[in-house]
Amino acid sequence: MSTTLPDIAVTEPSALHAPLRWVGMQDIAIPVRLDEAEPSGTVAARAQVQVDLPRPELKGIHMSRLYRLLDRHLEQPLSPAMLSQLLQAMIDSHADCGSRAARVSLAFEVMLRMPALRSEGLAGWRAYPVRIDAQSRAGRSEMRLQIDVLYASTCPCSAALSRQLLSKAFAQQHAGQTALRVEDVAQWLQRNGSYATPHSQRSVAQVRVDLVARVQSFDIRALVLLCESALATPVQAAVRRIDEQAFARLNGANLMYVEDAARRLRKELAERYASFHVAVRHFESLHAHDAVAETGSDADVFHMIAESHGQ
């Protein structure tokens, strides 16, 4: 009796002959070493690894080879160069399958410590969902970095309507008065400044950029800061009253429709990336539905409508 363990993926042909574009594994739990990750330098990630299967007669690929390669390469710090090496190793490991393409996806949250708006020495942690996609085909590698950034959006129309109500209330209460002291006006505003308030809401921008060849690092923090600077109203972590007041001022100075947010991001990204995509979503506090907008570079042409996930 043979003691050799059977491997039917190799010894048995496929009953249905057809090449497969991608075969592999997804949702693999694995630690990733990331120099930008605070405080430990390691993040818990979910990975996908796949190769093509062009030989139609083969029953399957060697999944364990892909897992071992992923595990071995992710012992190194994450970098574009390391992912390129992993992709080539995946293709080489499936030479007997005729594989010519491989792709990897990593999804994780990176924790970044961000300072408060005004309070000296005060800072807090914010979590940013990150996804990195890498693909190699015919000797050419492509990589994409995607992040989610949370921010606040205050409706310009609602702000205008609120100002109108406040103006009318002031005019009605001071009808017939030809002269008002500055102190009296200031006191009236202190009591009635919230006569009507515009609606605002937490919002999210999902930004994806294509990385150029030979880039040395993913530089996630730089992309986060670029997006938050463009939007001007990123959500905060640690706050005191002085920081909350500063945040209120930023929202008042940066009233935004969803279209405004998308265009702000487009302007900044277009100056630094040849190919990018932006999807913004405002979780409306006035409506029972969300407002969304998308934009991208000229190289970013067609996208299916994204599946909605309630939050």
Swiss-Prot record:
- The EC number(s) this enzyme carries: 3.5.4.16
Which BP terms does GO give this entry?
tetrahydrofolate biosynthetic process
Pathway noted in the entry: Cofactor biosynthesis; 7,8-dihydroneopterin triphosphate biosynthesis; 7,8-dihydroneopterin triphosphate from GTP: step 1/1
Q: Which GO terms describe its molecular function?
A: GTP cyclohydrolase activity; GTP cyclohydrolase I activity
Which is an annotated Pfam family here? GCHY-1
Q: Which reaction does it catalyse?
A: GTP + H2O = 7,8-dihydroneopterin 3'-triphosphate + formate + H(+)
Keyword vocabulary terms for this entry: Hydrolase
Record-annotated site: May be catalytically important:
C155
Q: What does this protein do?
A: Converts GTP to 7,8-dihydroneopterin triphosphate.
Annotated family:
Belongs to the GTP cyclohydrolase IV family.
What is the name of the protein in this document?
Answer: GTP cyclohydrolase FolE2
Q: Which organism is it from?
A: Xanthomonas campestris pv. campestris (strain ATCC 33913 / DSM 3586 / NCPPB 528 / LMG 568 / P 25)
State the gene name recorded for this protein: folE2
